[in-house]
Amino acid sequence: MRGAASLAAALTLLAPAVAGASREPAALAIAAWPARVVLTAPGRATIHVENPGVDPVVIDAAPSGYRLDLHGRPRLGAAGALAARVRVHPYRIALAGRSAVELTVTATRAAAARPGDHALVVLLTTRLPTGRALLAHLRIGVVVVLRVPGTVVRRLAVSGLRVERHRRQVLFEVSVANRGNVDEWLARRRLELRLVGHGRVLARLHGEPRRLLARTRGLVEARYAGRIRGPLTVVVTLTGPRPGVKVLRRAFQVRL
């Protein structure tokens, strides 16, 4: 469904049945798309929300803090000053079964905001319809990247390598810092690891794709299931770390 979002599709809080409810508990399923929007401040964007089920649902929409942990997993946080500059209309929806609605996200520019990307999330949280029993509150989110105009800085750096053995495979975790002010997408072939021994390239690995938010650091994972053991040199190659630089290389000494 055109990139329907199920971010943080979770979890939610079990809720008791409403006293006196005469019907079976409602089974909820909501969807939203796109999963990620980039909004230049000041400006506006549209989020589509759908209720594919037969039961009506009430949805509250509100901006919240958002970040990625070191492994790229989404985490919610307290709404910062920029979240106060974001408005969602309507912020409460009574959505009939098998129907959809459009939400408008509007952002104003904060005078003190730094140029570049600032990630938030618009949380869509279900509520109990009046007189109905509900097994759980469902929460999903749409990532909203608020882009403040100004000088764009793109700068990635490889800052470290960690090696861990997991049963029959070896996990390489490359620490990459986004020192720029815009989000970066690290596609699978943008980061390569070469395992070098005795002057020869013994294996080539590619990092798992992930996003790095502006001004953050994260780990890019690559897995090796071969039989190479002993001391090695791992050459990490990152393509396009900054304008004017095609590749960045760092070498690390490890033992498998």
Explain the meaning of each model-derived region.
Residues 23-34, 52-102, 187-202:
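Surface-exposed binding patches on compact interaction domains or structured appendages
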Residues 23-56, 92, 155-167, 173:
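Beta-sheet-dominated interaction scaffolds and their linkers
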Residues 31, 40-46, 99-103, 113-121, ...:
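Short, solvent-exposed loop/turn segments enriched in Ser/Thr/Gly
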Residues 35, 89-95, 161, 206-212, ...:
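Beta-strand-rich interaction surfaces with strong enrichment in secreted/lumenal proteins
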Residues 39, 93-101, 209-218, 244, ...:
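Short proline/glycine- and polar residue-rich coil/turn motifs
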Residues 46, 102-104, 219-225:
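Exposed aromatic-hydrophobic patches
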Residues 48-55, 66-68, 177-184, 227, ...:
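Short solvent-exposed strand-capping/beta-turn motif centered on an Asx-Ser/Thr pair
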Residues 55, 62-66, 108-151, 227-256:
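Terminal connector regions
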